[in-house]
Design a protein with these regions (language model features):
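A polyanion-binding, active-site-adjacent surface
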Residues: 1-110, 117
């Protein structure tokens, strides 16, 4: 059975790669990163001045951020869970190795790790 997750938005030459811990089931169901209403990513992005005009959460906006603003998206662990606390230590170890290879391969100018405790 194929694991449900979100696709990476990675390519050479990105200005920023936003790295989440892992996709939530909510985001996977909706098909885009940071999909949960009230996610702090969107107000922070809009306040940053990186995108003008302000954007609202959607799959199309994720693609716009990738194509127009050279902002990519990936996760430390690709296994979707209701909460990041449900990840096992093995998910983090495996994810760190894979993420390191992605960052070396795509070499973004900035890699931004996003996590909430």
């Amino acid at each position: 059975m194929k694991q449900r997750t979100l696709p990476d938005f990675l390519a050479p030459g990105l200005d920023i790669v936003s790295i989440g811990i892992n996709p939530s089931l909510y985001s996977v169901e909706r098909g885009f990163y940071f999909a949960r209403p009230g996610n702090r990513f969107w107000p922070a992005l809009n306040a940053s001045g990186l995108v003008v005009p302000a954007v609202a959460p959607s799959r199309d906006v994720i693609e716009l951020l990738f194509r127009k603003y050279h902002i990519g998206f990936t996760d430390l662990a690709k296994r979707a869970t209701p909460r990041a606390a449900e990840l096992a230590d093995a998910d983090y170890r495996r994810g760190a190795r894979v993420l390191q290879k992605k960052l070396v391969r795509y070499a973004p100018a900035i890699a931004c790790c996003l996590a909430v405790r």
